Swiss-Prot record:
UniProt name for this protein: ATP synthase subunit delta, chloroplastic
Gene3D superfamilies named among the record's database cross-references: N-terminal domain of the delta subunit of the F1F0-ATP synthase (1.10.520.20)
UniProt topology in membrane: Peripheral membrane protein
Lipid metabolism listed as a keyword: no
Keyword terms of this UniProt record: ATP synthesis, CF(1), Chloroplast, Hydrogen ion transport, Ion transport, Membrane, Plastid, Thylakoid, Transport
Function comment: F(1)F(0) ATP synthase produces ATP from ADP in the presence of a proton or sodium gradient. F-type ATPases consist of two structural domains, F(1) containing the extramembraneous catalytic core and F(0) containing the membrane proton channel, linked together by a central stalk and a peripheral stalk. During catalysis, ATP synthesis in the catalytic domain of F(1) is coupled via a rotary mechanism of the central stalk subunits to proton translocation. This protein is part of the stalk that links CF(0) to CF(1). It either transmits conformational changes from CF(0) to CF(1) or is implicated in proton conduction.
Pfam name, any one: OSCP
Main location: plastid
Annotated gene: atpD
Subunit structure as annotated in this protein's UniProt entry: F-type ATPases have 2 components, F(1) - the catalytic core - and F(0) - the membrane proton channel. F(1) has five subunits: alpha(3), beta(3), gamma(1), delta(1), epsilon(1). CF(0) has four main subunits: a(1), b(1), b'(1) and c(10-14). The alpha and beta chains form an alternating ring which encloses part of the gamma chain. F(1) is attached to F(0) by a central stalk formed by the gamma and epsilon chains, while a peripheral stalk is formed by the delta, b and b' chains.
Key word Thylakoid present: yes
Family per similarity comment: Belongs to the ATPase delta chain family.
Organism: Galdieria sulphuraria
CC annotations in GO: chloroplast thylakoid membrane; proton-transporting ATP synthase complex
Length: 177
């Protein structure tokens, strides 16, 4: 088993347990996703946090200034612990593991949908309702992607399942072509 995975899983499980006992799971899940998004949009900030030449104290102070009262105490302390233990480099993996644990605990199924054009809210809601029936999940989280090469229709992926409703797929599998 990959070492990053093991480390990330341990920290994610620990954070999940603490957040669960404090009834802060939804808030912390949202905050972790927001922080991950900020770090992805500002890679210089991430590189600053993982740089071993910068002191832990400077990193901690920077975290406190940047997120100044915008984070739950649990999330803030978690970030500070990651910095202190030199585990901030695993932050993305930890968030990914936390999301997996969250999805399992809330019976959420993540579904990737590729389409030629953007789906309307009504179309998304229709798909969510149908996918709940198919997957027996309480919640469906859609990851939407535009793929003009499909010509028309959709490709739906969840778990190890793939449903190809695209015109490209139908043409590819047609015995007449």
């Amino acid at each position: 088993m990959h070492n990053n995975y093991k480390i990330a899983k341990v920290y994610a499980e620990g954070l999940f347990e603490i957040a669960n006992t404090k009834n802060s799971l939804a808030e912390i899940n949202e905050q972790l996703n927001s922080i991950k998004s900020v770090l992805k949009q500002m890679p210089e900030f991430y590189y600053f946090l993982v740089n071993p030449l910068i002191s832990q104290q400077i990193k901690k102070n920077t975290i406190k200034i940047v997120f100044n009262n915008n984070l739950d105490k649990i999330t803030l302390n978690f970030l500070l612990i990651l910095i202190e233990r030199r585990r901030i480099i695993y932050f993305y993996d930890i968030v990914d593991q936390f999301i997996l644990i969250w999805n399992k605990a809330t019976n959420t199924s993540v579904v990737e949908i590729a389409s030629v054009i953007s789906l309307t809210e009504k179309q998304q809601q229709y798909l969510i309702n149908k996918l709940k029936e198919i997957t027996k999940a309480n919640y469906i989280k859609l990851k939407l992607k535009i793929d003009p090469s499909l010509i028309g229709g959709l490709i739906i992926k969840f778990g190890s399942n793939l449903i190809d409703l695209s015109l490209k797929g139908k043409l590819k599998n047609s015995p007449y072509i």
